[in-house]
Amino acid sequence: MWDQKWVIGNWKMNGRLQNNNALMHRFRIHPTAERVLIGLAAPTVYLLQLHNAMQIVLNNRILTCAQDVSRFPNNGAYTGEVSAEMLADTGTDIVLIGHSERSLYFGEKNEIQRRKMENVLNVGLIPLLCVGESLEEREAGKEHEVIAHQLSILQGLDTKNIAVAYEPVWAIGTGKVATVEQIADMHAFIYKEILSLCGSDVKIRVLYGGSVKADNAADIFAVPYVDGALVGGASLSYDSFTAIISAAQNA
């Protein structure tokens, strides 16, 4: 896992039961990509469906990922919340933390994201922390400062396995893609920060998550310190998503 390329598809608020089943069955014919860890982050209501399909149809070749988790650690009067323990019950393996849309629409900041990270780790799941700067922050030359602040929640966590997705907010859903030089700079910076915060013996995966498509995936995977991709809209298409997986396998 920690020496593979990761390709995680984030469905966001998309999916229906019938369409999900059809997609899972199409994956039956896709050849095994031994060098790639594949995951799908579905809406919570579909996690158990995906997990069961992955066991029955795909022999666990694709991991179940959740898009979010509650900041509250235990059961209680938190209407609408889903705890880390509940996600574990669905067979979830990986949990996204701090996606830019959670910050944009729900105002989530470091304190909440830290609590979510701890909850996920406490039940044995893998958190995937999302970090990234806005266009205004990049144009002001503050991208390193912003990312360092977001990564600071990693300090003191009881884990030696750190997964981060760098998602420049200005390149999500806009059709814009950071240059190879920009991606290389930010991923190298993130690696350096993680090692400083967590120690030299930590295992690291840093994914790129800014409008990854079938036609740019190979170039992105060739960038130093890019360990995979967090894929948005392209993960809803079997052909596009499997093309990205193939690019990772061949990187």
From Swiss-Prot:
The gene is tpiA. GO terms for biological process: gluconeogenesis; glyceraldehyde-3-phosphate biosynthetic process; glycerol catabolic process; glycolytic process; proteolysis. This is Triosephosphate isomerase. Keywords: Cytoplasm, Gluconeogenesis, Glycolysis, Isomerase. Substrate binds at residues 10-12, 173, 211, 232-233. The keyword Isomerase applies. GO terms for molecular function: aspartic-type endopeptidase activity; triose-phosphate isomerase activity. Involved in the gluconeogenesis. Catalyzes stereospecifically the conversion of dihydroxyacetone phosphate (DHAP) to D-glyceraldehyde-3-phosphate (G3P). Belongs to the triosephosphate isomerase family. It is found in: Cytoplasm. It comes from the Bacteria. Its EC number is 5.3.1.1. It comes from Neisseria meningitidis serogroup B (strain ATCC BAA-335 / MC58). Gene3D superfamilies: Aldolase class I (3.20.20.70). GO terms for cellular component: cytosol. The active site is at 99 (electrophile), 167 (proton acceptor). Homodimer. It catalyses: D-glyceraldehyde 3-phosphate = dihydroxyacetone phosphate. Pfam families: TIM (PF00121). The keyword Isomerase applies. Pathway: Carbohydrate biosynthesis; gluconeogenesis; Carbohydrate degradation; glycolysis; D-glyceraldehyde 3-phosphate from glycerone phosphate: step 1/1.
